[in-house]
């Protein structure tokens, strides 16, 4: 398997490089045509749409995928058998079991429903080779030691173990302090973890409770917000980001720190919310066992206005704002409601709070509860700044009730972090 991984590593690093947008789009359409002919014809579900153009295929989401999984996949796999395998692995914390040759994992269920993802040995090699090509700063043969702080392991991660690079899985369901001690003993060169875990690790280093050499850290599984990035940059040598979901390896940061969509193996249709924000509709033409075709994500992406100096023609993303259900919906002065994006709220709060303070803003009907590990007077300053912003957006702020609560915001390492929540 190592030779296949090396091939896909070379392909991602050297072969699938494009000088301009036109070359990239020509490559996408060639790969999509091959994907439709070689893969979708093997799926009972997708083969029924064979005469349609791609944009005429029905949209997918997690609920549709799970409901039609047995007909969608190309290997005759059964959803319930896969779910049983994945659940057993999560309960036992042993992620070696497979269903035949296929690795199985489960999503975290942030959107309310857990999904499953399946990978063949070939797909594991593609994933591993591509990830290594994009995220290793010194290349494959530099002897990197990579620490993976994840909620669940998977055979995907074991597929890249070799004499040139070592990976170690750190279980987020285990005692965090013990895991940090094991991390110090491992002395990694790269740490991959959710943003809240990297934040907790940075605070431990700042407080003298842990000692690590200068390392590159890569945020995964959660939105890396500006205040967290700023904190991490004060502690670690380099801060990168991977945007990955059950649906695929969607984006990663380049050498200039810009998040680029992985359009070399994804076709992305933007569903525009306004002139700069969109929900991505993705088709992954490298996924053969579990086809991902016109899958609509609830994540809100903001396009970077200026082109990135790295020269990558793939779409550059300014930031990931979170999910549609992270928006606040507040009463409007003119009647009805006003949708307030989470990102401006996060920035207003972050600009007021101390760098090491965390917070949570929760909406329940017209009640906004702001919790933070700082004095209540600072939270009240945040309330005032948010109210001013809401008023400029046409919100009837007199109808909003506030609660400011000074308390520690403990990291919930078992679940994806959401700082702004609408119930």
Kindly give the residue locations of the regions a language model identified.
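Nucleotide 5′-phosphate-binding alpha/beta core
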Residues: 1-106, 112-126, 132-137, 141, ...
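Active-site glycine/GP-rich loop and adjacent strand/helix microenvironment
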Residues: 1-30, 34-35, 166-423
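Short loop/helix-cap segments at secondary-structure boundaries that form the rim of catalytic
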Residues: 48-52, 158-160, 210, 232-233
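A broadly conserved amphipathic alpha-helix scaffold signal in soluble, globular proteins
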Residues: 105, 109, 129-136, 147, ...
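Acidic/polar active-site rim loop that often engages polyanionic ligands
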Residues: 108-111, 162-164
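Short, acidic Gly/Pro/Ser/Thr-rich loop/turn segments
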Residues: 114, 154-156, 287-290
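Glycine-rich, histidine-containing beta strand-loop boundary motifs that form or position
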Residues: 119-120, 150, 195, 243
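Conserved AMP-binding loop of ANL adenylate-forming enzymes
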Residues: 132-170
């Amino acid at each position: 398997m190592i030779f296949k991984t090396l091939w896909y590593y070379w392909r991602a690093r050297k072969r699938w490089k494009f000088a301009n947008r036109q070359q990239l789009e020509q490559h996408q359409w060639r790969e999509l045509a091959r994907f439709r002919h070689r893969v979708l014809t093997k799926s009972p579900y997708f083969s029924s749409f064979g005469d349609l153009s791609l944009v005429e295929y029905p949209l997918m989401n997690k609920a549709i995928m799970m409901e039609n999984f047995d007909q969608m996949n190309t290997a005759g796999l059964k959803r319930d058998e896969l779910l049983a395998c994945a659940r057993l692995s999560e309960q036992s914390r042993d992620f070696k079991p497979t269903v035949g040759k296929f690795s199985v994992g489960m999503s975290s269920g942030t959107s309310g429903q857990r999904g499953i993802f399946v990978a063949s040995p070939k797909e594991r090699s593609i994933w591993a080779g591509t990830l290594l090509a994009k995220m290793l700063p010194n290349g494959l043969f530099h002897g990197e030691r990579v620490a993976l702080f994840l909620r669940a392991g998977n055979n995907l991660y074991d597929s890249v173990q070799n004499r040139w690079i070592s990976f170690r899985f750190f279980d987020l369901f285990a005692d965090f302090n013990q895991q940090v001690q094991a991390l110090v003993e491992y002395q990694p060169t790269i740490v991959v973890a959710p943003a809240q875990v990297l934040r907790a690790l940075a605070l431990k280093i700042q407080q003298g409770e842990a000692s690590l050499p200068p390392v590159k850290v890569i945020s995964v599984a959660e939105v890396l917000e500006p205040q967290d990035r700023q904190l991490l940059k004060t502690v670690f040598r380099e801060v990168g980001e991977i945007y990955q979901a059950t649906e695929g390896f969607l984006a990663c940061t380049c050498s200039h720190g810009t998040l680029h969509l992985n359009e070399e193996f994804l076709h992305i249709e933007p569903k525009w919310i306004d002139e700069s924000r969109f929900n991505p509709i993705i088709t992954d033409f490298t996924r053969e066992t579990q086809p991902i075709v016109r899958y609509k994500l609830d994540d809100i992406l903001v396009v970077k206005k200026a082109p990135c100096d790295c020269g990558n023609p793939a779409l550059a993303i300014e930031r990931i704002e979170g999910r549609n259900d992270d928006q606040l919906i507040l009463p409007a002065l003119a009647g009805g409601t006003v949708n307030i994006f989470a990102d401006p709220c996060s920035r207003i709060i972050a600009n007021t709070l101390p760098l090491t303070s965390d917070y949570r803003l929760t909406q329940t009907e017209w009640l906004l509860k702001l919790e933070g590990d700082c004095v209540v007077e600072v939270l009240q300053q945040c309330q005032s700044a948010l109210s001013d912003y809401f008023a400029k957006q046409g919100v009837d702020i007199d109808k909003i009730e506030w609660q400011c609560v000074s308390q520690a915001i403990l990291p919930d390492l078992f679940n994806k972090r959401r700082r702004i929540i609408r119930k």
